[in-house]
A protein has these predicted regions:
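Interface amphipathic segments
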Residues: 1-193
Length: 193
């Protein structure tokens, strides 16, 4: 058995995506020069993929300033996505950050608009994945929702700490609480098949 060394660099420049629509029926149009570059180093077990997409359309979504990054700089893997989704009445900036290490994934989603009424906020959670015991081991996820703020129509709302557990086809929501003064949404319960 001979060991291989899969070390490579790539630098892809994208000018025209007509072939994706024609052959693969992917509804993607790139309007300006976009790039996808990175590397994979087998010996160091490192990877990095970064993409820049200044202006594109996927189905009916118009996107500007798109950026993706995926890398494993140390003992974790990190992914970032940033974009501006253009709407008829303004734009929405979106940012997704995720880090994974030791069966844990930390995720933060930020959004904000630039219209007359503000809609913005953050959703942050940490998911822990583990296997259930027994004859047929299943994947279980425990998602801890972190406290954050959300602005809906210029009004500050709070997301309070809660937990969601996904186990064997069941989803348990434990004390999800979203509030503004005396108005709130509280969810406790189980979704099942």
């Amino acid at each position: 058995f001979r060991s291989t060394h899969n070390n490579f660099l790539f630098d892809i420049h994208i000018y025209n995506t007509d072939i994706l629509s024609t052959i693969f029926d992917i509804p993607l149009t790139v309007y300006t020069h976009s790039t996808l570059k990175g590397y994979f180093n087998d010996a160091l077990q490192r990877l990095r993929i970064e993409g820049y997409f200044p202006r594109l359309q996927y189905k009916n979504n118009y996107i500007e300033s798109g950026m993706i990054l995926c890398e494993n700089p140390a003992d974790h893997i990190r992914a970032r996505v940033r974009l501006t989704n253009l709407k008829k009445k303004g734009a929405v900036n979106l940012s997704l950050d995720a880090q994974a290490k030791d069966d844990n994934v930390s995720t933060t989603l930020d959004w904000g608009n630039n219209a007359a009424a503000t809609y913005s906020g953050k959703l942050a959670a940490v998911a822990k994945f583990l296997r259930t015991s027994g004859e047929k081991s299943l994947l279980k996820a425990m998602v801890d929702v972190n406290p954050t703020d959300v602005i809906l129509n210029d009004t500050l709302w709070k997301i309070h700490p809660s937990q969601v557990v996904v186990d064997s086809g069941r989803v348990d929501v434990n004390n999800f609480y979203f509030s503004h003064q005396d108005r709130y949404v509280r969810i406790n319960g189980r979704l099942s098949e």
